[in-house]
């Protein structure tokens, strides 16, 4: 790989085994032009393997490559024999050609099932990541809290997507406990407190999520500054009151037993 420090890396979903076969044999990946993530284009792409890859390989990021060339082509050029999706034949896609497909010596894992599509990150974070939550490139406040939570061995999930009353929300941090769910939210003072409209939205959002059974802890950069230490005991106390964290394997079994109704980080069951 060339020098990619501070460059954009895109984590993308491999929905089918055939997508990996194409990467290995032809070296390209396709993304609909209308739904391509921002920022665009990425310098490199890494691939999150969905449930179709089976127990040993699902929820892992193993393959990656540097982007060599990007073309815009209709779907019929990518898949000329795909009669099942003939109605999509004229839709335009980015064909992202990689210079070479690489494998990480140790894959990045997701402890809990996540149905994600894209995660923009940096090459520096991708190199150091051990689990998927290490990849999120949020605010400096979120990154500091994530480091602090790992230090006290709290298995939180970053940017966890939930649906409440038909609305989609992303939680900065979700902690699944034996007797409840804890949401930990962070924001910058200037972002959320200089606007009355933002205050109104945040209040409504927190009330909606709270009525869905989530307990809330909310911190701002004005409160925390550079040191999370005084707040970690409060977070740990909230977790203890909810029975402690639920082990990821138990969470996975719960999802498996309730496929029809247990929606995990997405619009549909995994």
Regions found by a protein language model. Give the residues of each.
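Composition-driven recognition of long, C-terminal low-complexity regions enriched in serine/threonine
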Residues: 144, 153, 157, 203-207, ...
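Hydrophobic transmembrane alpha-helix bundles
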Residues: 93-101, 193-205, 253-268
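Acidic-and-aromatic substrate-binding clefts and catalytic sites of carbohydrate-active enzymes
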Residues: 163-168, 224-228
């Amino acid at each position: 790989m060339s020098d990619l420090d501070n460059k954009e890396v895109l984590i993308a979903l491999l929905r089918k085994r055939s997508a990996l076969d194409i990467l290995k044999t032809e070296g390209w990946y396709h993304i609909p032009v209308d739904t391509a993530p921002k920022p665009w284009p990425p310098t490199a792409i890494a691939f999150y393997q969905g449930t179709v890859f089976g127990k040993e390989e699902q929820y892992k990021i193993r393959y990656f490559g540097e982007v060599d060339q990007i073309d815009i082509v209709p779907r019929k050029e990518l898949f000329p024999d795909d009669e099942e999706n003939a109605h999509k034949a004229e839709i335009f896609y980015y064909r992202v050609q990689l210079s070479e497909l690489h494998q990480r010596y140790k894959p990045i894992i997701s402890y809990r099932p996540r149905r994600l599509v894209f995660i923009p990150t940096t090459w520096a974070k991708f190199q150091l990541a051990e689990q998927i939550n290490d990849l999120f490139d949020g605010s400096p406040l979120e990154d500091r809290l994530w480091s602090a939570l790992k230090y006290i061995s709290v298995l939180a999930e970053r940017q966890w997507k939930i649906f409440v009353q038909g609305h989609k929300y992303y939680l900065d941090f979700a902690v699944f406990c034996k007797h409840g769910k804890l949401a930990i939210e962070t924001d910058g003072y200037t972002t959320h407190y200089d606007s009355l409209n933002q205050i109104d939205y945040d209040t409504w959002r927190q009330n909606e999520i709270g009525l869905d059974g989530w307990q809330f802890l909310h911190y701002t950069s004005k409160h925390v500054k550079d040191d999370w230490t005084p707040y970690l005991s409060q977070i740990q106390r909230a977790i203890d009151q909810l029975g402690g964290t639920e082990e990821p394997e138990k969470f996975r079994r719960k999802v498996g037993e309730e496929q029809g109704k247990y929606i995990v980080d997405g619009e549909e069951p995994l």
